[in-house]
């Protein structure tokens, strides 16, 4: 029989690596609470038109990368979400969440894109994102950038650069688009096949080309920022001023356009040189027209998403210290006949918030194994203490508490007094 394995580019996340994911997620939840962002969870399957309408029909995601299929029950076209912003906006519109004012939301979860797997790019990947909906001011742009910047500090990440640009408003983009097309048409011999295909449908995306042969051409192209009106420029200047006041270092990247068509005004990316071609770890911007495009009443919004796999890879590259939670205690049980008393004791400790790992029997009917092997496993578990439930101790209604990591001598404690020990243990974490 053929061995069944995971789909290429869709990876299992196993212990102990999963502990790194939990550590990152816990850091994010704590930080989001400080900024008053609340969690939202949306389905991983959405109607295909949501992404076609929201992301743009001529984007790479919609044209090439979506996992789409027909529902066998009703013929509806469905898609595994390739990103989360469109789904969050759909939920906000469907449930009239902005009726009483703006909302700050965050999400975590898997996304899906049909592309060639490589380092930092997978078919199932995970994103964490923040969305501030209903806030028109430049201060909302700045705050959400500051939120991401604060996260890097919380995680201990270094050498992450912030790049900014402004895409202006639709009328400004139309003027720039005409100038850009006219410029590119003068250099048709330099354009690659993809650029020629995009020339009249989505020329702005040509500026984001990775083709080395087109870099000089792109560098000389008309800059969108030179077409911005006074209001757009003032919005951008306010964002930059707030970042400057907070000591956030940034650089202007006039070629930064992002991969979805829904952006306007501020766009940004946090990038690193340590992950090769997949150097963008977080990106986002303002999307004031997406809510209306999806069927809601016009409302402003701004947000970002980070790639979890890329952030964890960068943490590994920088050898950042990632806490790996271990049990507080490991129960050493020499005799299986003591298991009823032992397990009742461990349940009481767990109810008090103590994390306890219990040694299991080696095999059915073969006992609990030697004390030496149990202590070896206790030490390997990373637990701070071993709780030794020996026959002599249990006869006295006691247990031996042996430090494995902390300083101090082992001591015998009455089972009835373990509640006091548990309280002391928690206060010393």
Swiss-Prot record:
Cited InterPro entries: aa-tRNA-synth_II (IPR006195), aa-tRNA-synth_II/BPL/LPL (IPR045864), Anticodon-bd (IPR004154), Anticodon-bd_dom_sf (IPR036621), His-tRNA-ligase (IPR015807), HisRS-like_core (IPR041715), HisRS/HisZ (IPR004516)
Q: Which UniProt keywords apply?
A: Aminoacyl-tRNA synthetase, ATP-binding, Cytoplasm, Ligase, Nucleotide-binding, Protein biosynthesis
Write out the GO biological process terms.
histidyl-tRNA aminoacylation
Q: Might you give the EC number(s) for this enzyme?
A: 6.1.1.21
Task: Report the superkingdom from the record.
Answer: Bacteria
Q: What class of enzyme is it?
A: ligase
Predominant location of this chain? Answer: cytoplasm
- Pfam families xref list: HGTP_anticodon (PF03129), tRNA-synt_His (PF13393)
Do the record's keywords include rRNA-binding? no
Is Protein biosynthesis tagged as a keyword?
A: yes
Question: Which PROSITE patterns does this chain map to?
Answer: AA_TRNA_LIGASE_II (PS50862)
Q: Name one GO cellular component term.
A: cytoplasm
Q: Where in the cell is it found?
A: Cytoplasm
**Catalysed reaction equations from the record:** tRNA(His) + L-histidine + ATP = L-histidyl-tRNA(His) + AMP + diphosphate + H(+)
Q: Give the GO molecular function terms.
A: ATP binding; histidine-tRNA ligase activity
Q: Which PANTHER family match?
A: HISTIDINE--TRNA LIGASE, MITOCHONDRIAL-RELATED, HISTIDYL-TRNA SYNTHETASE
State the oligomer form and interacting partners. Answer: Homodimer.
- Similarity remark: Belongs to the class-II aminoacyl-tRNA synthetase family.
- Its name, as the record gives it, is Histidine--tRNA ligase
Q: Which organism is it from?
A: Acidovorax sp. (strain JS42)
């Amino acid at each position: 029989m053929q061995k069944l394995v995971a789909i290429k580019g869709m990876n299992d996340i196993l212990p102990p690596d999963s502990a790194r994911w939990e550590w990152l997620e816990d850091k994010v939840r704590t930080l989001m609470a400080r900024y008053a962002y609340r969690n939202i969870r949306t389905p991983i399957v959405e109607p295909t038109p949501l992404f076609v309408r929201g992301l743009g029909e001529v984007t790479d995601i919609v044209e090439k990368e979506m996992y789409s299929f027909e529902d066998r029950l009703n013929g509806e076209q469905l898609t595994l979400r390739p990103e989360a912003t469109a789904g969050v906006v759909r939920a906000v519109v469907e449930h009239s969440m902005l009726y009483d004012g703006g909302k700050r939301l965050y999400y975590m979860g898997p996304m899906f894109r049909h592309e060639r797997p490589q380092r930092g790019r997978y078919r199932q990947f995970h994103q964490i994102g923040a969305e501030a909906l209903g806030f028109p001011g430049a201060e909302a742009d700045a705050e959400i950038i500051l939120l991401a910047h604060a996260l890097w500090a919380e995680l201990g990440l270094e050498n992450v650069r912030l790049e900014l640009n402004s895409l202006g408003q639709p009328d400004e983009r139309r003027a720039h688009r005409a100038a850009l097309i006219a410029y590119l048409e003068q250099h048709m011999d330099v354009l690659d096949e993809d650029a020629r295909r995009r020339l009249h449908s989505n020329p702005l995306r040509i500026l984001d080309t990775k083709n080395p042969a087109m870099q000089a051409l792109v560098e000389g192209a008309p800059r969108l920022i030179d077409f911005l009106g006074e209001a757009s420029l003032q919005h951008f200047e306010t964002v930059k001023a707030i970042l400057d006041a907070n000591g956030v270092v940034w650089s202007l990247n006039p070629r930064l356009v992002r991969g979805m068509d829904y952006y306007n005004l501020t766009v940004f990316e946090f990038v690193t040189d340590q992950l090769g071609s997949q150097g963008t770890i977080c990106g986002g911007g303002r999307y004031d027209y997406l809510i209306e495009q999806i069927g809601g009443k016009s409302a402003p919004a701004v947000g970002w998403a980070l790639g979890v796999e890329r952030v964890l890879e960068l943490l590994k590259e920088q050898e950042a210290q990632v806490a790996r939670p271990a049990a507080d205690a490991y129960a050493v049980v020499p005799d299986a006949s003591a298991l009823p008393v032992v397990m009742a004791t461990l349940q009481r400790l767990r109810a008090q918030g103590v994390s306890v790992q219990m040694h299991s029997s080696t095999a059915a009917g073969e006992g609990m194994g030697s004390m030496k092997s149990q202590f070896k496993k206790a030490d390997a578990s990373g637990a701070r203490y071993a709780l030794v439930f020996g026959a002599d101790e249990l006869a006295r209604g006691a247990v031996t508490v042996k430090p494995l990591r902390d300083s101090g001598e082992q001591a015998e404690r009455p089972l009835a007094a373990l509640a006091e020990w548990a309280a002391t243990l928690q206060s010393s974490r």
